Amino acid sequence: MMFKQYLQVTKPGIIFGNLISVIGGFLLASKGSIDYPLFIYTLVGVSLVVASGCVFNNYIDRDIDRKMERTKNRVLVKGLISPGVSLVYATLLGIAGFMLLWFGANPLACWLGVMGFVVYVGVYSLYMKRHSVYGTLIGSLSGAAPPVIGYCAVTGDFDSGAAILLAIFSLWQMPHSYAIAIFRFKDYQAANIPVLPVVKGISVAKNHITLYIIAFAVATLMLTLGGYAGYKYLVVAAAVSVWWLGMALRGYKVEDDKVWARKLFGFSIIAITALSIMMSVDFMVPNSQNLLTYVW
């Protein structure tokens, strides 16, 4: 029973979602030549770091979690694990994760993990989430760290491919998170969390969602234009972006914003999973010509 509680406080759903993106970044950089020990070290290392961040987040958010229907039954809110024990647990998870990334992958992968962790726990959870409408934007940077860690674990270098991945996953986070804030509007309002839909209104949030999806669509295409992913990836990226944008535009005419937002959120998961899979299997081999070559 205790094992279940210690697992729940790490938010396994978030860990699983991040692992999909780590695999995407790792296999994109591997280009068919997979170092399996490095692969395992990277996956386990990122999992532990993400788990640590989630436990710290649960500790920090104990007060506001009590006010939200979605989170009122979390382990720390119900007192199933003491706050002190959770801090020790989170610290041990983090140390183990960072050590695996440093010694099993490379220092760059570890430092990227540290930066993502600091942004999520130190900047987003401790301050921005509670005090600024820009909290989601800051948090998106930490959410984009896992695929970049996977990529840089292989390359050992933060190149344009890593920058494109950072852009794709950061931009994806915004409409994904705003959709959650719309269909969980009352929860965020009750907890006094200044997310965009609550502070500026749902209509403004819809405008932001549309603009971020357009920016996301452009960013996804850059992997092929830059010579990192193939044309099958390009087709899938274009298709999911157009469909997601269409869903966003239909939001201006819907009668039930919550139902629409849930559908938009659901498709965001499908979209990022599809892209992660496609970049894993449809990569460009070294020295391949890319479309930007013909432009210049």
From Swiss-Prot:
Pfam families: UbiA (PF01040). Its main location: membrane. GO terms for cellular component: plasma membrane. One of its GO terms (biological process) is heme O biosynthetic process. It is an enzyme of class 2 (transferase). It is found in: Cell inner membrane. Pathway: Porphyrin-containing compound metabolism; heme O biosynthesis; heme O from protoheme: step 1/1. Keywords: Cell inner membrane, Cell membrane, Heme biosynthesis, Membrane, Transferase, Transmembrane, Transmembrane helix. The keyword Transmembrane helix applies. It is a multi-pass membrane protein. Its EC number is 2.5.1.141. The chain crosses the membrane at residues 10-28, 38-56, 79-97, 108-126, 198-216, 229-247, 269-287. PROSITE patterns: UBIA. Residues 29-37, 98-107, 217-228, 288-296 are periplasmic. GO terms for molecular function: protoheme IX farnesyltransferase activity. Residues 1-9, 57-78, 127-197, 248-268 are cytoplasmic. InterPro entries: Protohaem_IX_farnesylTrfase, UbiA_prenyltransferase, UbiA_prenylTrfase_CS, UbiA_sf. It catalyses: heme b + (2E,6E)-farnesyl diphosphate + H2O = Fe(II)-heme o + diphosphate. Converts heme B (protoheme IX) to heme O by substitution of the vinyl group on carbon 2 of heme B porphyrin ring with a hydroxyethyl farnesyl side group. Carbon 2 of the heme B porphyrin ring is defined according to the Fischer nomenclature. Belongs to the UbiA prenyltransferase family. Protoheme IX farnesyltransferase subfamily. PANTHER family: PROTOHEME IX FARNESYLTRANSFERASE, MITOCHONDRIAL (PTHR43448:SF2). This is Protoheme IX farnesyltransferase. It comes from Salmonella typhimurium (strain LT2 / SGSC1412 / ATCC 700720).
